Amino acid sequence: MSLAIVHTRAALGVNAPPITIEVHISNGLPGLTMVGLPETTVKEARDRVRSAIINSGYEFPAKKITINLAPADLPKEGGRYDLPIAVALLAASEQLTASNLEAYELVGELALTGALRGVPGAISSATEAIRAGRNIIVATENAAEVGLISKEGCFIADHLQTVCAFLEGKHALERPLAQDMASPTATADLRDVIGQEQGKRGLEITAAGGHNLLLIGPPGTGKTMLASRLSGILPPLSNEEALESAAILSLVNADTVQKRWQQRPFRSPHHSASLTAMVGGGAIPAPGEISLAHNGILFLDELPEFERRTLDALREPIESGQIHLSRTRAKITYPARFQLIAAMNPSPTGHYQGNHNRCTPEQTLRYLNRLSGPFLDRFDLSLEIPLPPPGILSQHASKGESSATVKKRVIAAHERQYRRQKKLNARLEGREIQKYCVLHHDDARWLEDTLVHLGLSIRAWQRLLKVARTIADIELADQISRQHLQEAVSYRAIDRLLIHLQKLLA
């Protein structure tokens, strides 16, 4: 036949919309025309496919060839269309006799020798193909990724000849091996942190409720050390969460997908990171750090050193759990539900009081003004991590609880929240807060007076209630008490610091 149709998948974010490759061969001047909004990388496929077909022992048709990538309104880039184009060409030129092409989807880049190479986004393509009721053939390089989904419906191949022999029924293809869960890497333990008991308590509350945390203190007090221990007290990812995170990671770095399977992402971008690097972007938008941290932790060290517009761009994703990227050629939505952990010094010199302070209150306030009020409002807890008291380093005091012990309480708190409301406390919204964060009348009035004194917003009031609810869950209490509220209010270090500086300037 002179017309052949082969199915494949595009890669638009974590989605993999279906693409139909239509190849028509007719009489006329030899040449190849490709239509359907192909990018430069796709147009280059004509040369790769020609060499791959010839070096695989087939003939490249010396006729007029028209290739259509439908639908035409979807942008298409990368070498993922090489394999389906080559198979469609061979079928249209009657060098490949396969009657069951409709049952398969093909995704893979071709080398000039005909060898198959892996492509980004194989997890999304395989998931969507299986959901559509088709089998999918991918390169052996993608075997570890698709093996995370299911070996049913997936085939792996290493050469164009192998794929053609399989489609003709002459050769069997291997299925990807089901990937075993990678053994968890050794994480740093909370017992390594000397002192800072309030910081450890705040870290436990952060993990138990899925809250955002801001650590404030002089240099060298253990802020970064505490933040790096958070992943060690969080429960492992569920299979569904792990697949979501793996699908995003496979778009940028497929080699590490299997190694980090079911480990919560921990992203720590440098403070020089641009807006595009943080939220994602490009002509066809690629995921940024906030999407790569989906279901995990985004740690921002030296917070005031980030560009203000970069930090303010995080405000909407923190609330919605996703980021919408609109460009001329594509509009893509990436998931971005992460826990934001940040660390900062209270002043340019690292200290705002005591013998080490070399800044005036005006300089300190100007430094803190790099962070907008609405952005600081997104933190559920802000903790001061002070210098250790004299003698603590020389004393052989108890090192406190291990990460494993704290992790058990965190998992118990998670289970309690999911039984009660099907989500973590940090994700509670308006009416849910009214339903699950009920206060006694006297406690509600006390909290309102405290908010007025600290000058906090309605959003901060809601976040205080959610933190208090988490503290109650850790204590296995059904009702939020005054003690829980007082502890939640104690984790507002940034507000107390600003009030202190304003009093000095008054």
UniProtKB/Swiss-Prot annotation:
UniProt-recorded name of the protein: Uncharacterized protein YifB
InterPro entries xref list: AAA+_ATPase, CHLI-like, Mg_chelat-rel, Mg_chelat-rel_C, Mg_chelatse_chII-like_cat_dom, P-loop_NTPase, Ribosomal_Su5_D2-typ_SF, Ribsml_uS5_D2-typ_fold_subgr
Family statement drawn from the similarity comment of this UniProt entry: Belongs to the Mg-chelatase subunits D/I family. ComM subfamily.
Pfam families found in the cross-reference section: ChlI, Mg_chelatase, Mg_chelatase_C
Classification via SMART domains: AAA (SM00382)
GO function terms (MF aspect): ATP binding; ATP hydrolysis activity
Cross-referenced NCBIfam families: PRK09862.1, YifB family Mg chelatase-like AAA ATPase
